């Protein structure tokens, strides 16, 4: 009987320790250092995510909180926060558990495009990255050497994680709509979320659009992928804004 109790206690301790991790892998990789970074672990729709204070990824926020948080947050793409985040430096520390963190180097040359919608703003940012073989969950805190929160994990491409901050090319559209991601069609001429086989067909489409415009808040932000990625804002079929993006990864995984 004692053996069973001891086994149960060991399993409970292991489960408790696992629950405090902000990585999915058990064996930590990279440069691991002793560092205490607070975080709370949550679960929504069967997926774990973390938060630190008021800071959490927008795409993890429960729907009933979106409108409330959008009114009061500072506008970092992909991140809700009631406080200003610490500025980005050359080094950062990414939380592994309550006692350890991975030391990483910020890469400003390799950038990931992240987008977010909170019901008020549709934001985009060409974010710097860090590389790690660890499998972090969304919301994992990223801090500077003094423990100030720089950002939280939002998205990645393979082993490269985006670091959302005020650094990097970015902006926003005032829109209540979510981003629409469009896969590029082979050849043709892009306009908003559509692709036309010829310039003549494109001109005919534009000429046929009605003169009046709907409410600006109904405009749809569009991300077109491919080798020549671009952003657009579309209202009633009319392209109101169009941005070409260069040297940025757009095919990313939101955690």
From Swiss-Prot:
It comes from the Eukaryota. It catalyses: 2',3'-cGAMP + H2O = Gp(2'-5')Ap(3') + H(+). Transmembrane segments: none annotated. Keywords: Hydrolase, Nuclease. One of its GO terms (molecular function) is nuclease activity. Disulfide bonds: none annotated. Belongs to the poxin family. Highly divergent. Nuclease that cleaves 2',3'-cGAMP. HAMAP family: Poxins (MF_04143). This is Poxin. InterPro entries: Poxin_vir. Its EC number is 3.1.-.-. It is an enzyme of class 3 (hydrolase).
């Amino acid at each position: 009987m004692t053996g069973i109790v001891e086994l149960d206690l060991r399993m409970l301790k292991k489960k408790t320790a696992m629950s405090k991790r902000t990585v999915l892998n058990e064996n930590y990789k990279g440069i691991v250092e002793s560092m205490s970074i607070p975080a709370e672990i949550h679960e929504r729709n069967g997926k774990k995510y973390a938060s630190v204070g008021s800071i959490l990824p927008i795409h993890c926020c429960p729907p009933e909180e979106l409108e409330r948080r959008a009114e009061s947050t500072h506008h970092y793409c992909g991140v809700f926060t009631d406080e200003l985040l610490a500025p980005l430096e050359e080094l950062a520390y990414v939380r592994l558990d309550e006692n350890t963190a991975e030391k990483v180097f910020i890469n400003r040359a390799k950038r990931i495009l992240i987008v977010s919608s909170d019901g008020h703003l549709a934001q985009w940012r060409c974010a710097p990255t860090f590389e790690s073989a660890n499998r972090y969950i969304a919301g994992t805190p990223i801090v500077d050497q003094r423990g100030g929160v720089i950002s939280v994990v939002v998205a990645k491409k393979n082993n490269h994680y985006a670091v959302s901050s005020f650094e990097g090319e970015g902006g926003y559209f005032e829109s209540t709509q979510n981003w629409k991601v469009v896969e590029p069609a082979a050849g043709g001429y892009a306009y908003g979320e559509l692709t036309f086989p010829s310039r003549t067909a494109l001109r005919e489409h534009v000429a046929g659009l009605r003169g009046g415009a709907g409410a600006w808040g109904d405009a749809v932000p569009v991300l077109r992928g491919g080798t020549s990625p671009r952003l657009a804002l579309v209202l009633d079929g009319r392209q109101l804004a169009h941005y070409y993006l260069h040297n940025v990864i757009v095919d990313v995984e939101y955690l």
